[in-house]
Amino acid sequence: MTNPGKTLWLAITCLALGCVWTQAQPSAPTPGQWASGALGQTLDVKVMAPKADSPSHPLPVILYLENLAAPRAGTESDEVILHDFIAAGYLVVTLDYAHNPKARVPWINRDLLALRESLLQKKFLGEFEIDLNHVFIVPAGSRLRRDVVFYREPGRTLAMDIIYPTQPAQPVGAVIEFSCDNQNRMGDGSLTSCSDTLLDGEATEGLAVAMADHPVKAPYKGIDPMPECAWKIKAAVRTLRAAGTTLGFNGKIAPVGFSRGSGMALLLVTTRGMNAFEGRGECTNTSSDVQCAVVMSGRFTYLDLMPEDHMLPRYTKAWGERTNHLEAWRQAGALDYLPQATLPLFLTINCTEGPDAQLQMATLRKRLAELGSDEIFMMDHEPRGHKVSLVPDILSGINIYLKTQLAR
């Protein structure tokens, strides 16, 4: 009998091995162009500013990517979409990829990061006052729905921003991420520092993507209170699924998580079907189930920590001495809710992550193996430390995994 996890792994391996990153040097851009490192050439650029009397200052930005290599998922015309973005007060910038075969995952991810970096450093669109907390990379044929509320608590309303193919020819799956910026979920500085291009990349491949507020308000100190965090992230999944019923989604959702968001992605898997974490937040009559998850470097259990872990004093202050309050420590870890084999997971971590992070990933993998749960694991051998991978094999593997699981 064929093992579906191994079959998927073989497919990912065979396809990913063809993805070799070689960065050609583009010619110097002229006004109206942007230098694409992924393609090794310049792209034609058009900038469309909102009316002078627009109240949006600094300006939120839409980077609208045209003529990508991946099949276009949304069927609504660019003319209508762009008109609406400009009317809503966005500074709209179109970049024409001219159907270059490398204008897709995994190669385009380097461009997606470079675009965000160039805005942050004022090397691109420097003549405009830009709202760096609201820069959205939108593939042609897609729209943006902002500030979709999924949870309310005193002093804070949690919401998400959804980029989705509009009027899709076929229903699409959705990917959700909980931001590593606890203050501004789309903060360009946070996305750039983490080299996080996952949602931007998957949107170019025809999936709907949602960046959600992290369940813990700023400032983040490494403590994820339970059961509150579970209430909030499940409300986010329910809300995304409910929104998708009118936006052309197929009802299948995958969380992806890095750093402080990785435990949230895993928690959605390990607490599937646990009613104790339901009934709070929006859309309580909708399912919070997820169909798969991408889990990167993070903390998954607090029962197996290194003696010199620098966070131990903070955990002890929050939960008491571990020997006397073991259950409180257990309840804080996403992995410790897993009673049996679960969904096949995609796992990855950088080879130069610290020993604490490596131990967490090793512990997660060991537990999955003990339970007989399928996993796909890819080590990132590009020595970049605590970053989301930009390695083509890994990005391609994630993309194939998500498309496969969200189509089932």
PLM region spans:
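C-terminal catalytic histidine-bearing segment of alpha/beta-hydrolase fold enzymes
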Residues: 161, 346-348, 357-408
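Alpha/beta-hydrolase active-site loop
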Residues: 103-126, 224-244
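Short, proline-enriched alpha-helix->beta-strand connector loops that line the catalytic pocket
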Residues: 132, 286-291, 339-345, 374
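N-terminal cap/lid segment of alpha/beta-hydrolase-fold proteins
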Residues: 25-56, 138-169
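Active-site-adjacent alpha-helix of alpha/beta-hydrolase-fold enzymes
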Residues: 194-197, 203, 310-324, 349-377
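Short substrate-entry loop that stabilizes the transition state in hydrolases
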Residues: 53-59, 65-104, 168-172, 178-221
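Mobile cap/lid helix-loop segments that gate and shape the active-site cleft of serine hydrolases
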Residues: 71-74, 141-147, 152-155, 269-274, ...
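Primarily recognizes the serine-hydrolase "nucleophile elbow" in alpha/beta-hydrolase
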Residues: 117-143, 238-307
